[in-house]
């Protein structure tokens, strides 16, 4: 009864983020490489579906934020032009039950001392890399300063819970590389949100949401070089 959601602009506290990551880590661990989890479907169909929104979003993003982005704008453009790359990477990475839209609005937070939280809105749930959920949540839920300060400890908490039962081998170093590559998906999400600012009938706070997400993903692009990591991951997969 005391559960609440938070807005994308407000985000959540670091302590709340820690407990959310513990929660999703337990889910990811439970369904790690579980073939019963439905896949995302045909790759070509996914690319065809996401291409037009990406192009629409790119026009809006470049116009609204181009002067702020500097050299990092090229990473957003690359993500727009290479939908196939990140869809293939998503399909070829270690699979688990991924939420697919893991942002603060899709978590019910409580005031319980245990930090209990409930993950909601699983309409995009299915087989995918769990680290994509993690990257989306950390980057979109925390301020730039909070992420930079606490990113490493949050990732270690997630990794410790994920691998606690020792049933699969996934080193922290491997996971951090995957986290960098997965951050490219947050750039794509920023494209989509920017596109909604140029779409009639969008929610009234879409400009504030888009501005906040762009600021956070821009910093992530500068800090993590996600496109570079994604390119390296694709080269490994195709070798």
Region roles according to the model:
Residues 101, 121:
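Conserved catalytic-loop position in the HRD/HxD motif
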């Amino acid at each position: 009864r005391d559960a609440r959601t938070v807005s994308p602009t407000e985000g959540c506290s670091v302590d709340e983020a820690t407990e959310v990551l513990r929660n999703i880590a337990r889910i990811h661990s439970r369904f790690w490489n579980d073939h019963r989890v439905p896949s995302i479907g045909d790759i070509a169909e996914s690319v065809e579906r996401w291409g037009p929104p990406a192009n629409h979003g790119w026009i809006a993003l470049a116009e609204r934020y181009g002067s702020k982005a500097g050299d990092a704008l090229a990473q957003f453009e690359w993500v727009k032009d290479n939908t196939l790359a990140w869809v293939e990477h998503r399909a070829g990475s270690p699979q688990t039950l991924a939420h697919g839209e893991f942002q603060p609005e899709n978590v019910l937070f409580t005031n319980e001392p245990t930090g209990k939280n409930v993950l909601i809105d699983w309409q995009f749930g299915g087989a995918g890399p769990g680290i994509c959920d993690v990257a989306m949540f950390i980057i979109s839920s925390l301020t730039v300063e909070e992420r930079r300060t606490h990113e490493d400890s949050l990732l270690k908490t997630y990794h410790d819970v994920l691998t606690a039962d020792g049933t699969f081998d996934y080193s922290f170093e491997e996971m951090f590389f995957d986290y960098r590559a997965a951050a490219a998906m947050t750039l794509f999400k920023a494209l989509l949100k920017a596109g909604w600012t140029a779409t009639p009938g969008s929610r009234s706070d879409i400009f504030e949401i888009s501005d906040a997400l762009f600021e956070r993903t821009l910093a992530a692009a500068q800090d993590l070089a996600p496109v570079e990591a994604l390119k390296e991951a694709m080269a490994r997969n195709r070798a």
